[in-house]
């Protein structure tokens, strides 16, 4: 099932997601729905908070990028970055921040401890694009969006688009969750 994507300023995107204690049929269904939703958008990574579930769960598939065609889709549960190395800047975008792109500096290599869809533990090293996508998605689990990591001058350039998203004035080729703008209350 295709799930609607929550967009910029939705509270679920700024909350710290809760760890999973295991994988049952409802989590397996959510994982399948997340892959379907990611491919429909199309995207290369999707975190559970982006589809309204405050859980430490994400899916990644960078094989649609020509130079990464050999990579397999990946399910990551309860990730924890245990070490980082190098740094580089690269343009990022996000399904939850449609129409916005900007450079973000991140470590170019990470060692990640996580559980897979069978809840089996792994510790692996990732570099380049895969390291970047994983860090971007893990940020979602920690309540951080890529625009929060952009240089201030770059963020100012996209502020009008961010304001439009915040007000629910955004069009996408994929379904987005209903957006209820905050209403000012007079004291």
UniProtKB/Swiss-Prot annotation:
EC annotation from Swiss-Prot or TrEMBL: 3.5.1.88
EC class (word): hydrolase
Gene Ontology terms describing biological process: co-translational protein modification; translation
Bound cofactor: record note: Binds 1 Fe(2+) ion.
Cofactor: Fe(2+)
Catalytic residue positions: 137
CDD domains: Pep_deformylase (cd00487)
Position of the signal peptide: none
InterPro entries linked to this entry: Peptide_deformylase, Peptide_deformylase_sf
Molecular function GO terms recorded: metal ion binding; peptide deformylase activity
Swiss-Prot/TrEMBL keywords: Hydrolase, Iron, Metal-binding, Protein biosynthesis
Disulfide bonds, paired cysteine numbers: none
Catalyzed chemical reaction(s): N-terminal N-formyl-L-methionyl-[peptide] + H2O = N-terminal L-methionyl-[peptide] + formate
Binding residue positions for Fe cation: 94, 136, 140
NCBIfam families hit by this protein: pept_deformyl, PRK00150.1-3
Annotated function: Removes the formyl group from the N-terminal Met of newly synthesized proteins. Requires at least a dipeptide for an efficient rate of reaction. N-terminal L-methionine is a prerequisite for activity but the enzyme has broad specificity at other positions.
Family note: Belongs to the polypeptide deformylase family.
Protein name: Peptide deformylase
The species this protein was found in: Chlorobaculum parvum (strain DSM 263 / NCIMB 8327)
Taxon lineage: Bacteria, Pseudomonadati, Chlorobiota, Chlorobiia, Chlorobiales
């Amino acid at each position: 099932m295709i799930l609607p994507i929550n967009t910029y300023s939705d509270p679920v995107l700024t909350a710290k997601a809760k760890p999973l204690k295991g994988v049952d049929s409802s989590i397996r269904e959510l994982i399948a729905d997340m892959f379907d939703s990611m491919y429909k958008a199309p995207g290369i990574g999707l975190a559970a908070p982006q589809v309204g579930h405050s859980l430490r769960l994400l899916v990644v598939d960078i094989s649609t990028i020509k130079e990464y065609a050999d990579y397999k889709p990946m399910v990551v549960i309860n990730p924890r970055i245990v070490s980082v190395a190098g740094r580089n800047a690269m343009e990022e975008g996000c399904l939850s921040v449609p129409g916005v792109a900007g450079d973000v500096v991140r470590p170019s290599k990470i060692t990640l401890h996580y559980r897979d869809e069978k809840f089996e533990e792994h510790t692996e090293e990732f570099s380049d694009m895969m390291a970047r996508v994983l860090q971007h998605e893990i940020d979602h689990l920690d309540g951080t969006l890529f625009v929060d990591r952009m240089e201030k001058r770059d963020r100012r350039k996209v502020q009008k688009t961010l304001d439009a998203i915040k007000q629910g004035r955004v069009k996408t080729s994929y379904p987005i969750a209903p957006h209820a703008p905050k209403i000012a209350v007079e004291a």
